[in-house]
A protein has these predicted regions:
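TPR/TPR-like (Sel1-like) alpha-helical repeat modules
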Residues: 115-120, 131-134, 146-151
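Conserved hydrophobic register position within alpha-solenoid helical repeats
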Residues: 32, 63, 95, 126-130
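Pro/Ala/Gly-rich low-complexity, hydrophilic intrinsically disordered segments
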Residues: 138-169
Length: 169
């Protein structure tokens, strides 16, 4: 169906919407989400948006992953909202990870916000995602990344002989 014409894809996506709404098994809903991410039409997009608010965390995680495939500023907005509002730590961690997977600098403010989270797992995941987005490696020091995130364009690393030796050994 993905290779078919746009009418066939739209019709299939509408069937997926009905399946998503009727399905009780979260594993099946998660698979429907994965399938929907590959279609660029309103019905498929509605499945991906709705999946973010599913009662089951497995489906919300699948929705986060679907937004990585979709990409763009809309994906950043939805993943940021999921990071900020979800009560399940696994979903929040996936949202932060997926923000990094987008490799879009527009995600930096949200990832900087994640550095301020009280949970060290969120902070660690935010550091890993900032490494992906920025292409830099400031180590795992959350404070160094906080400093960098304030103004990424102005940040420059201090060069020292000691730092060169540390990197060698």
């Amino acid at each position: 169906v993905k290779d078919g014409n746009s009418e066939a894809r739209a019709g299939f996506s509408k069937k997926l919407v009905n399946e998503m709404m009727a399905e009780h098994d979260p594993r099946v809903r998660a698979e429907i989400l994965k399938c929907s991410a590959g279609f660029d039409n309103p019905s498929a997009r509605a499945i991906c948006v709705g999946g973010l608010d599913d009662p089951d965390s497995l489906v919300r995680i699948a929705a986060c992953d679907a937004w990585v495939e979709i990409g763009g500023d809309e994906a950043i907005r939805h993943l940021a909202n999921r990071f900020r509002s979800d009560e399940d730590i696994d979903v929040r961690l996936h949202a932060v990870r997926d923000l990094g997977s987008l490799e879009n600098e527009a995600a930096i403010p949200v990832l900087a916000e994640a550095l301020e989270a009280p949970d060290p797992a969120i902070q660690f995941r935010a550091v890993a995602s900032l490494k992906e987005v920025s292409g830099r490696d400031l180590g795992n020091d959350v404070n160094a990344w906080r400093e960098w995130a304030v103004d990424p364009s102005a940040y420059r690393e201090e060069w020292s002989v000691a730092e060169v030796w540390r990197q060698i050994f």
